[in-house]
Regions:
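Signature of exported/secreted
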Residues: 1-238
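Local sequence-structure signature of Cys/Sec-based thiol-disulfide redox active-site neighborhoods
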Residues: 240, 248-283
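Conserved thiamine diphosphate
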Residues: 245
């Protein structure tokens, strides 16, 4: 884990902290190391990644489902600092894993997309290659400072586990860094000479935020790094994306490919122009 690159932000964080001793952006500047660098967990706990018995192979399922988001508009609550208690084994495991970065990890974000979904990308020789995607966030301030929410664009993960849960060959989860920005920030700020609090926002980039398994059972992680084909991975990731963004079930095409597709299907062109990517907002 490496803290956020302050040069990627639109605000001058250092200047704001110097000008306001009570600024809760101090928490952002001081968060340069994970809460825990390493953690030992029983193998049996990773069986939560196994698909439900009723699952149809290739269909995604929820590990943590967002049932009624706290704030549909994602606004910052003045008195929320710590996450609710975990209620399922999957929540407990993910809470411990992502809690290695910061203890105040919320497994369901304040606004969609939210939660964690998984899908079996490949099943072979009694081993499941599972991809998962998590939308979580961290509240990194502590009283009396006001809340500051750190929301990664997503965590993308992979688990290679025997279908009976007896062997874990590979585990990793990371915030993708292929885009220019990958973290949203929201915090409460006090207006000068007033008791009124306002929400401020920014967006930036964290260069590295990842979890990895150090000593897998059986084969080494390198053995499994290429065990899934590009087509299998692409198909599985597309299904995960559709869990969080149902509109992606409709095929979208770049402008350069639209004319050819329209001719092939003998259909008219419906044009949609957006300011940024649809699937991960501005991230």
């Amino acid at each position: 884990f490496r803290g956020i690159d302050v040069s990627s932000l639109t605000k001058n964080v250092a200047e704001e902290v110097l000008s306001d001793p009570n600024s809760n952006l101090r928490a952002l500047l001081s968060w340069n190391e994970p809460q825990q660098h390493a953690k030992a967990l029983p193998l049996s706990r990773f069986s939560v990644f196994l698909p439900p018995r009723s699952n149809v192979h290739g269909d995604p399922w929820w590990l943590v489902e967002a049932k009624g988001l706290r704030n549909s508009d994602g606004h910052v609550e003045a008195n929320v600092y710590e996450p609710p208690a975990c209620s399922t084994p999957a929540e407990a495991l993910l809470g411990e894993l992502f809690g290695m970065f910061h203890r105040n990890v919320f497994l369901v974000t304040r606004a969609s997309p939210a939660g964690t979904a998984a899908v079996v990308a490949r099943s072979r020789n009694g081993t499941l290659d599972i991809l998962f995607r998590s939308h979580i966030e961290f509240q990194i301030s502590a009283p009396p400072d006001r809340p500051l929410w750190f929301t990664p664009a997503q965590f993308q993960g992979r688990v290679v586990i025997s279908n009976d849960g007896s062997a874990l060959h590979h585990f990793e989860a990371h915030v993708p860094t292929d885009r220019q920005l990958n973290v949203d920030l929201e915090w409460l700020a006090q207006q000068h000479n007033s008791d009124v609090q306002r929400t401020e926002v920014d967006i930036g980039k964290v260069a590295e935020m990842a979890l990895r398994l150090d000593s897998p059972s059986g084969q080494s992680p390198e053995t499994y790094s290429s065990s899934i084909s590009y087509n299998e991975e692409d198909k599985a990731l597309r299904k995960l994306h559709q869990m969080f963004f149902p509109f992606l079930k409709i095929p979208y095409h770049n402008l350069s490919a639209t004319v050819a597709e329209a001719k092939r299907h003998e259909k008219l062109v419906h044009s949609i122009i957006t300011w940024g990517p649809l699937d991960d907002q501005s991230c």
